[in-house]
C-alpha cells in the first residue's frame, strides 16, 4: 500500500512537472482558436450553397471559395440517414477539444461554449443506435414546408442567381427522392412516425394550382425585377416553368404517392417516441437540443409543472380581483388595438422600445406580403427572414395578406414577436454588436431566439396604451399556462408513452375539456413534432427566471435597459452563456 502510494505520488509529481514545462501561450491559443472557428465557418458554408446564398451577398469577402460550393439543395442522407458522417464530425470535435478554454478571451469562451454545446449534442444524436429516428416530414416544419417557402422567398440579386435558382429547382426531385428512400427505410425498420394525412393534404395544396402556382409566379417576378433584356427574361422564365413542373411538382407528387402507400400498407407509429427501443433516450437529446441547456426531461417537467401552477394562480387572482376587466377574455370578445396596418405597429414599437431596450443604429425594415398560396394554408400571421451578414441590412418581414385581423391583440403580439422588439430587433442588435460570424450564422440555439421573441412579445403588451393592462396581464398568464400544459403533454407523449386517451385524461385533469376531434388534432400535432414547442416556452421561462433573479438581487438598482443589454450581448447562445452575461451585469450593479 505504501509502495503504491509512493509510485502514484511520483507519477503525479512528474505529470505536474511536465505540465509546468508546457505553459500555454495564451495569445497563440487565441489565434489558433480563431483560425479553427473561421475554418469551421468556411467549411460549413462551402458545403451548403443554400446557407451561403441566404447569409452572404458577397461570399468571397468572407473567405468562401465558391468553386468548392455545389449549387444544390444540400447533402443527401447516407445509408444510415446521416447528413454529415460521424467521422467528419468527430474529427472537427476532436480538434476543438485540444483547445484550452481558460486561455481564451471572454468572447472566445462564449464561442467555445456554443460550439461545445452544439457539437456534443450532435455527436450523441449521431450514435448509430438512433439511425432512422429523425424525420424529414414533420407536420409543422418538414421539408414539404421548407421547400415551398424557400423557393417562394428566394432572393434573386443578379443573373447568376437566376441560373442557380433553375439549378436548385431541378435538384428538387433528386433531393426529395433521396429523402423518400431514407423514409422508406424508416418504415422498413419500424421507425416511421408521421402525420400522413396532414402531409398528403399539404401536397394537394401545392399540386392543385399546378403551373399557375403563386410560388412560380413569385420566382418569375424576381426575374422580371432584374430588368434583363426581354429575350433573356423570357428564356429564364421558360426554364423556371419547365424545372418547376418536371422537378418541383413531380417531387411533391412523389411525396404524396409515398405517403398514400404508407397509409395503405405501411407500419406507422401513431404514438410517441417512447414506443421505440431507444425512443426515450433520443427524446431527451432532442429536448436538450431544443431548450438551450443540458437539463433533463425531469428538470423540464418540474419547471413546467411549477410554471403552470404559477400562471394559473396569477390568472385566477386577476379574474377574482378584476372580473369586469377580464370579462372580454372569458367571453372571447377581446378589444381591438386600434392599429390599421403592420407598418403602424412596427413604427410605434421602434419608437417606444428605446426606453427599455439598448439602441440599435439601423432598424430599417421592409414588409412584403407572404406568398398567397402559402398564406392561405399556413394560418401564419407573419414571419421574419434572416438578413444577410453583409448587404444593406434592411430587415425583411413577411406578413399574411388574407387571414388575419391587423387590429387584433393576437396580430399585435405576433408582429412584436417577429418584428420589434422580437426577432427583427434581436438580429439587428446582434449584427451590430457581435463580431463573430460563427455566432451570427451557425449558432443554432432556437431556445434563445424563440424564447427571447416570446419574452419580447409579452413585454410589448405593456406598450398597448389603448387596452386595459389588467386584461392584457390575464391574457398573457392564460396563454402561458396553456403552453406549459402543451409542453407537459409533449413529454407525456414522447417520454411516458401516452395514448390519445391518456392525453385526453391529462387535459381534463388540468381543466381543459375538448371534444374528441380537437383532442385527436392536438395529439397528432404533438406526436408528429417532438419537442417543437419547447424552444418557445422553456426558452421564455429561462429568460424570465434570470430576470426575476436579477430583480430580486438588485432591487431598485435593477434597470430594464441594462438587463436587456446583458440578455442580448452574447448573441444566440445556450443559456449557460447568457447566464454568465446576466451574472456579470448583476455583479457590476450590486
Regions found by a protein language model. Give the residues of each.
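N-terminal maturation segment of proteins
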Residues: 23-590
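Hydrophobic helical h-region of N-terminal Sec-dependent signal peptides
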Residues: 10-15
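Intrinsically disordered, low-complexity segments enriched in polar/charged small residues
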Residues: 8-9, 422
Amino acid at each position: 500500500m505504501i509502495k503504491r502510494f509512493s509510485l502514484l505520488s511520483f507519477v503525479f509529481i512528474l505529470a505536474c512537472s511536465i505540465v509546468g514545462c508546457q505553459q500555454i501561450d495564451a495569445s497563440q491559443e487565441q489565434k489558433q482558436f480563431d483560425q479553427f472557428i473561421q475554418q469551421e465557418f468556411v467549411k460549413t458554408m462551402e458545403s451548403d450553397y443554400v446557407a451561403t446564398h441566404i447569409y452572404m451577398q458577397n461570399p468571397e469577402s468572407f473567405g468562401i471559395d465558391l468553386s468548392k460550393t455545389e449549387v444544390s439543395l444540400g447533402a443527401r442522407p447516407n445509408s444510415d440517414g446521416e447528413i454529415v458522417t460521424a467521422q467528419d464530425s468527430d474529427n472537427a470535435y476532436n480538434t476543438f477539444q485540444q483547445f484550452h478554454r481558460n486561455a481564451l478571451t471572454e468572447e472566445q469562451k462564449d464561442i467555445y461554449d456554443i460550439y461545445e454545446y452544439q457539437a456534443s449534442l450532435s455527436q450523441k444524436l449521431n450514435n448509430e443506435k438512433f439511425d432512422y429516428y429523425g424525420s424529414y416530414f414533420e407536420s409543422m416544419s418538414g421539408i414539404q414546408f421548407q421547400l415551398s417557402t424557400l423557393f417562394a422567398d428566394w432572393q434573386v440579386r443578379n443573373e447568376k442567381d437566376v441560373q442557380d435558382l433553375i439549378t436548385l429547382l431541378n435538384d428538387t426531385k433528386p433531393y426529395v427522392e433521396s429523402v423518400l428512400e431514407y423514409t422508406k427505410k424508416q418504415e422498413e425498420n419500424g421507425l416511421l412516425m408521421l402525420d400522413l394525412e396532414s402531409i398528403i393534404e399539404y401536397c394537394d395544396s401545392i399540386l392543385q394550382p399546378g403551373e399557375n402556382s403563386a410560388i412560380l409566379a413569385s420566382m418569375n417576378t424576381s426575374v422580371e425585377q432584374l430588368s434583363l433584356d426581354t429575350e433573356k427574361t423570357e428564356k429564364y422564365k421558360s426554364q423556371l416553368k419547365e424545372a418547376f413542373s418536371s422537378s418541383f411538382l413531380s417531387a411533391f407528387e412523389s411525396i404524396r404517392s409515398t405517403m398514400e402507400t404508407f397509409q395503405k400498407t405501411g407500419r406507422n407509429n401513431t404514438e410517441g417516441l417512447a414506443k421505440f427501443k431507444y425512443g426515450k433516450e433520443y427524446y431527451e437529446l432532442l429536448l436538450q437540443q431544443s431548450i438551450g441547456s443540458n437539463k433533463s426531461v425531469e428538470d423540464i417537467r418540474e419547471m413546467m409543472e411549477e410554471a403552470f401552477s404559477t400562471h394559473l394562480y396569477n390568472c385566477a387572482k386577476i379574474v377574482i380581483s378584476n372580473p369586469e376587466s377580464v370579462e372580454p377574455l372569458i367571453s372571447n370578445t377581446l378589444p381591438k388595438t386600434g392599429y390599421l396596418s403592420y407598418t403602424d405597429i412596427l413604427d410605434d414599437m421602434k419608437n417606444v422600445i428605446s426606453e427599455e431596450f439598448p439602441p440599435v443604429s439601423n432598424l430599417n425594415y421592409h414588409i412584403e406580403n407572404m406568398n398567397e398560396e402559402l398564406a392561405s394554408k399556413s394560418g401564419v400571421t407573419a414571419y421574419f427572414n434572416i438578413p444577410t451578414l453583409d448587404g444593406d441590412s434592411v430587415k425583411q418581414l413577411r406578413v399574411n395578406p388574407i387571414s388575419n385581423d391587423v387590429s387584433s391583440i393576437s396580430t399585435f403580439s405576433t408582429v412584436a414577436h417577429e418584428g420589434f422588439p422580437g426577432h427583427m430587433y434581436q438580429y439587428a442588435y446582434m449584427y451590430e454588436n457581435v463580431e463573430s460570424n460563427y455566432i451570427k450564422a451557425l449558432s443554432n440555439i432556437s431556445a434563445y431566439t424563440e424564447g427571447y421573441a416570446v419574452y419580447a412579445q409579452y413585454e410589448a403588451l405593456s406598450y398597448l396604451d389603448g387596452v386595459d393592462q389588467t386584461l392584457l396581464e390575464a391574457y398573457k398568464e392564460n396563454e402561458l399556462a396553456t403552453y406549459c400544459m402543451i409542453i407537459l403533454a409533449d413529454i407525456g407523449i414522447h417520454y411516458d408513452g401516452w395514448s390519445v386517451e391518456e392525453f385526453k385524461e391529462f387535459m381534463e385533469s388540468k381543466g381543459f375539456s375538448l371534444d374528441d376531434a380537437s383532442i385527436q388534432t392536438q395529439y397528432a400535432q404533438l406526436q408528429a413534432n417532438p419537442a417543437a414547442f419547447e424552444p418557445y416556452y422553456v426558452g421564455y421561462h429561462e429568460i424570465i427566471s434570470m430576470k426575476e433573479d436579477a430583480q430580486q438581487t438588485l432591487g431598485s438598482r435593477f434597470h430594464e435597459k441594462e438587463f436587456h443589454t446583458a440578455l442580448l450581448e452574447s448573441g444566440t447562445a445556450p443559456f449557460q452563456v447568457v447566464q454568465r452575461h446576466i451574472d456579470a451585469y448583476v455583479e457590476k450593479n450590486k
